[in-house]
Amino acid sequence: MGSAFVFAKKEPIKNAYSMRFDLDWEVASGLPEKAMLVSLQGLANREEAQLYIIHPPDFQWEITEPLFDFYKRKHGVSYTEIKTVDAALERFKSSAKGYVVWDAEVGPSLNIAFTIAGLEDGVVVTEALIPIVQKHGLKPIDDLRGRYTGQSHAEIYSDAIKRYWHRCNRDKIMLMGGHRGRVMMPAMADWGIRERMFFHELSADPEEADELVLNRQLLEDLNVGATVFGWHPYGKDTEEQSTMLLSMYGIKMEGLHNLPNLSYNCQFDFTPGFRFTNNHQVAKDAVLIAEEKVYITFVQSDSVGIGVWTKPGRGKLPFAWQVTMNWTKFSPAALEYFHESATPNDYFIGGLSGPGYMYPNNIPKDRFPVLMEEAKQLMTVLDEHVMEIMDNSAADGNVGNADLFEETVDAYYEAFPDVLGFINGYGPARTRDLRDSRPMISYDYYIDPKRPRDEVTADLNELITLNSKRPYFLAVHVRESNDVNSLVTVVENLEGPVEVLALDRFLKLAASNKTYETRFRKEDDPVHFKGY
């Protein structure tokens, strides 16, 4: 059952190539070569899994080296390292039909070049890189230098839509936002090129109406069930605006813009005989009785805690980890790696909000059941019994209103009759409920990675004092890049009696004694972003 929802794949080749990147993504230095190489990677990996890129341990997606070792160990792949751009072009020049020149003075031109590269089988280059691609016999496909000088982003993408959109993939689109300006980090471009996606960074901010109308045009043209890959453009709009907009169309988001190697990862299935087995601490039909104490559970979201999994200390405390469930479709080996390397204290949960990152208060009612059925099937494959929900459409980053309307809660309870329960929020939220034996508990606390641990301890002790009714069920969201080691001392200094539990035991106990009030988002609750 473990591979039921993975596209049928032929056996990947056993002799592949690897490259190592550094952390220099500056437009003036490291970006041009990296952009060319990830475009070449997308072409080289279109028919075979030929090229894998390893990033440094302090890159945001820190698992590229462990996953590289996993491919060698579990799939029997032997890699030859390519150390130079020249050598990469020599090896893979047959995968490319030519090159597209982007204008380093006009940032959006890189996205246009990526779009053309996917459609025309090209690599993207700046003016300085033209000699090296010509040396390897590549011919010019298009030259964007000067084409978009002085134009607004809306003008640039309006032109690109007219020229290229009709030829692009309608099941997938690349929102290549994220870092902008002096630093750009398009590590996911290989995937967009392989899949012939349209690349853009159009704003979802109503204040930029000329861009928003184009953004909506693209979303409206996508097929039902489509996915947006990438991430919103920093400094132009907010994550809340972008995700709310996608959710209004019933479209899933899979990020980030710098998630590497999908063109390679998508070609591997789970290893023969592999089946997900989660670290359940309690049977689904078990009945537990809460005592007069404080129960705490820690949850890491953000795609299995971006940047945390390989750090020391994991396993010392019970932790739940939100899994990007759609990786069963385009990165199965990564999910198998996480499950293989999990400790008994690591517990996997579904999310975020469904079969992709979405804001459920805004999902169209006719799409909600279909999307949640997809999520339910993925959770079955992944042996997950808890769904994590997040809706920040009315919030301001990690603060503000992250609550769910009652009709949204109703829809979740109807869609997931067999889960142990639900966790809600990102920052603290107030939505809580209990129906039959399935609680919905919102986070009471959010641990910012930069907050000193003694202040985190003081905050949690204050919550324990303020919430004097026992048992008190304290769900804590541990933001990405917070390592487990840093929380061990926090737990040791909490004022008891306190027990840190795995999430499934926590929810079972929360079902036994409802000391929390049922609450949903109200129409007159304050909102930061009023919507569209």
Where are the regions that the model predicts?
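Long, solvent-exposed N-terminal ectodomains/accessory regions
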Residues: 1-188, 192
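Non-catalytic propeptide/linker segments at domain boundaries
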Residues: 191-314
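Core alpha/beta catalytic barrel or barrel-like domain that forms the active/cofactor pocket
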Residues: 347-357, 385-393
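Acidic (Asp/Glu)-rich catalytic clusters
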Residues: 309-315, 330-353, 375-381, 464-467
